[in-house]
Amino acid sequence: MKLYERLMTIDRRIIYGILLGVVTLPLIFPSVVKVTPMSPVEKLFTAVDNTTNDKALILDCSYSPQIKAEVEPMAIAVLRHAFKTRKKILVLSLYVEMIGLATRAINQVVEEFNSNAQTYEDSLIYGRDYVFLGWQPPPIVPMLGMGESISNIYVVDYYGNQTDTLQMMERIRNYNDISILVALSGSRIPISWVAYAQNRYGLAVGVGCTAVSGADFYPYYQTGQFTGLMVGMKGAAEYEELVEANYGVKGRRVASEAMLSLTYAHLAIILFIVIGNIGFFLHRRRK
């Protein structure tokens, strides 16, 4: 078999084997890839950073298990940022199947911080520093209703506590007391937040989404309807980089570790495309 024929007929098992290797090896032996944060992520980071002591931020963890790998690192990065800078944060999910993932992210970050806390003041205390509102159907009800009264929509929190008795909620009544809402989703939920919460109440909306949703959301960012935007694993890695670079928050950076696998996989695919094209042009020249 001639060279160009070999280049054009590489066994698919070889291709899949190489791809399997370049994807799995960096995950087995993880290392962090430093990324340069882009403007959409920097603006979201700044908006969260600018939350004042008299206001809170809302984190909407409305992502499903199918997109957990992409979006959960965003939730963890935002929570680390908020807790490190002592921002008040309300967490919610718009659908019941996403409650477990939101709980997992909160518990992980709270345990990280409290394991290093020296005093009660240093610790993250439920009801004082953060509140998990849980789930209230249908989605349009909390989107519109929280503009008037959060405690009227979420009478009790996820754990059954009366919302209006929690220390943090004494000052946080409606969207006037919220600096920004960060919506993490792989669907069109962030657009609904714009339609119902931003257009009516002027609430700032930031977004974290999957890579395939990015093209749908960039126009909203470009028009200023989205304050900031994290897209896919790269967006999560950029936010992780900002949190560590600005505040020295140490913790496993899952998105930054995954970027190495993505980079190697893309390079391998490009290499195979180049090899196939070289074989094609050699074959055509022989003719």
Q: Where do the language-model regions lie?
A:
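Alpha-helical transmembrane signal-anchor/signal-peptide segments
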Residues: V33-N50
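Membrane-proximal low-complexity regions enriched in glycine and acidic/polar residues
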Residues: G127-D216
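N-terminal membrane topogenic signal
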Residues: E5-I15, S261
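Short extracytoplasmic
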Residues: F45-P73
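Short, aromatic-rich amphipathic segments at membrane interfaces
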Residues: Q225-G228, G232-T263
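Juxtamembrane interface at the cytosolic side of transmembrane helices
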Residues: L7-M8, I273-K287
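Membrane-embedded segments
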Residues: Q66-V131
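Hydrophobic membrane-insertion alpha-helices, especially the h-region
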Residues: R13-I28
